[in-house]
Amino acid sequence: MFERNQKTIFVLDHTRYFSIASEEYISMDFLKGKPSGDGGATGAAGNATGSGGSQFSKSLWTCACESSIEYCRVVWDLFPGKKHVRFIVSDTAAHIVNTWSPSTQNMSHVMNAMVMVGVPSRNVPTSSDYSVIHGLRAAIEALAEPTDEQLAAMADLGTDELPRIPNKGRVICITSARDNTSMKSLEDIFNTVLVQQNTLAAPPAKKGLVIDHCHLVILNIVPLGVESLVTNRSLLKISPLLDVEIHTVSAPDISYKLTHLILNHYDLASTTVTNIPMKEEQNANSSANYDVEILHSRRAHSITCGPDFSLPTSIKQGATYETVTLKWCTPRGCGSAHLQPCLGQFLVTPVDVTSRPSSCLINFLLNGRSVLLEMPRKTGSKATSHMLSARGGEIFVHSLCITRSCMDEAPSITDGPGGRVSDYRTAELGQLIKMSRMVPLKVKDPSAPPLTRRLPRYFPLTTSSSILFHLQRHISWLPHFLHLLVKEDMDKQDEVRCQQHIHELYKSASRGDVLPFTHTNGARLKLSKAKDQYRLLYRELEQLIQLNATTMHHKNLLESLQSLRAAYGDAPLKSEPGASLLRSFTESPLSPERLEPISSVGASGSSNSNSLLKASKRRMSSCGQRSLLDIISSAERSQSNKRLDFSGRLCTPLGQVAKLYPEFGTKDKDAVTTGASITPNVKEESVRS
């Protein structure tokens, strides 16, 4: 509730230095049309044309007052009655401009007090009594004073044993220092006074609230074009009670700096409404497009954007922060069915409240009109993401839902990413969930099967992905047959029934009966296609039995089915049982056919000339075929058999390690030995000579 931005205190340096000009000259020659140059001309330009008295420059004090008052205006517009801002002017002493009382937390009171303070006099002699330290001491004392909300919370607590009220705050000091040493001295004095104030607030004195934490922001301002010896510094933790950051900025840019800081201080975002059609002031028959920058809560963008949208951001000239660019959307009539739901509404305030585009937009909204704003999608199209409207004299930005909202109907399960799917086995899935319901037991049963045995091992999600479960709607005995296959306690009688059904399938295949598929539209299939369907049916049936083969009766059924497949000419390849079981678990029944070994293809080619055609038609992988690793391994072995093996491996006895380069080093030894035998002869010949 009591956050760090609950209390903000501005300490304004009112010493003699702040009476000098900011060196940003503003033209006053309005009778000759628009000024030819930018209003923020340099000092040299001002001196060149300033002899006619058509330009003037604000003082450092005026720049500091205007920017700080704009800061508190934004705070009070967006957080009326919730966030508090105080002002303290420091020269020979600390002058309190306003208090935490709601009666002084308004623009009129602050501006009237600033008028009474006035610009610092240049005729005041330089003295050590003029210092900003007086204002910093008063700011710490002001942080210890409770606000009305804190007083109400203290009254609700009642006793001292309850947790004390959190008390955090921020002090923004606008001053001008000579160098980093002066800044370091200012930090040390502030930290010392902060510790002393907490000592006074602790029992038994209890003079005010204990300050839990303080954030000190020092703005060192200088005239335009003057270099400062004070370096910028990001947020630094001085002590457990104090964090300090330092910014050096020219006087004309202090408003941009405070706007940048307020975004982080109050979690705000900047939005620029572009392409606002507006009548020209001098020519009512023509119109031009203007831009207006507004501030609001950052959540206005975060709750709207989805993965398909990206915020278009830009940096305003002279500023250092990013602003989101949204385009003015021409209102178009639409019924209530086309209105987008609102995710949230947030107060809005313009950055430059005195500009003509801002005032026109504010009056347009206060007259009861609404403005729709567009943001681009990643695909290139646009979507209406926000709406500006006014109620009760306050302007709000509404975040519209541009993605699927919770009020929309749930997406249909038939709208899959691969197209429209309409044959999900929804009813069977519900039955499976009921059968798989688990309940906790007070005493563990040692004879109970493990949990992995109770989990479903094979369940096609769609009817079109399974031949076996597709036919159960058209063959009367097939549902009961499938129920018997997955029984954990299959007995001999169930095995006999299943054997009879398997033999019926074999007889139907022998007679050439066509399986009753709905997609055949009653047309009789070719014999080769009917055989392929029976082969697919046998393979899926074998996969289902193998996954549920937990009893001896299941294993007998599996052997019987494999023998029938062999008699039908579709015998499975011999492979390792572990690999086949793994493939049964991990593969879909309609996955593509694997490549078969060259030897098996050659053997089957003599018996069936259409084996390649049938293999291309097969859409199911059986448990006895090879994996990708087997295919790659066999290909590597076939290539290695064509090359002669390493001679060292061939000559080395089994169990020993082959020596690489066995003659390596032998020639060098022979050369050394030969050289040693030749050297004495050479010496003898030289002695003789």
From Swiss-Prot:
Signal peptide residues on this chain, from the entry's feature table: none
Keyword set, alphabetical order: Cell cycle, Cell division, Coiled coil, Cytoplasm, Developmental protein, Differentiation, Meiosis, Mitosis, Nucleus, Phosphoprotein, Spermatogenesis
Post-translational modification: Phosphorylated.
Compartment(s): Nucleus; Cytoplasm; Cytoplasm, Perinuclear region
Nuclear localization signal (NLS) (motif): residue ranges: 613-619
Coiled-coil regions listed in the entry: 521-550
Biased composition annotated in UniProt, kind: Low complexity: 599-614
Keyword Chaperone: no
Any one GO cellular component localisation term in the record: integrator complex
Pfam families: Mat89Bb (PF10221)
Segments of this protein annotated with the region Disordered: 591-619, 669-689
GO biological process, one term: snRNA 3'-end processing
Function: Component of the integrator complex, a multiprotein complex that terminates RNA polymerase II (Pol II) transcription in the promoter-proximal region of genes. The integrator complex provides a quality checkpoint during transcription elongation by driving premature transcription termination of transcripts that are unfavorably configured for transcriptional elongation: the complex terminates transcription by (1) catalyzing dephosphorylation of the C-terminal domain (CTD) of Pol II subunit Polr2A/Rbp1 and Spt5, and (2) degrading the exiting nascent RNA transcript via endonuclease activity.
Subunit description: Belongs to the multiprotein complex Integrator, at least composed of IntS1, IntS2, IntS3, IntS4, omd/IntS5, IntS6, defl/IntS7, IntS8, IntS9, IntS10, IntS11, IntS12, asun/IntS13, IntS14 and IntS15. The core complex associates with protein phosphatase 2A subunits mts/PP2A and Pp2A-29B, to form the Integrator-PP2A (INTAC) complex.
PANTHER family assigned: INTEGRATOR COMPLEX SUBUNIT 13, SARCOMA ANTIGEN NY-SAR-95-RELATED
Family designation: Belongs to the Integrator subunit 13 family.
UniProt name for this protein: Protein asunder
Organism of origin: Drosophila simulans
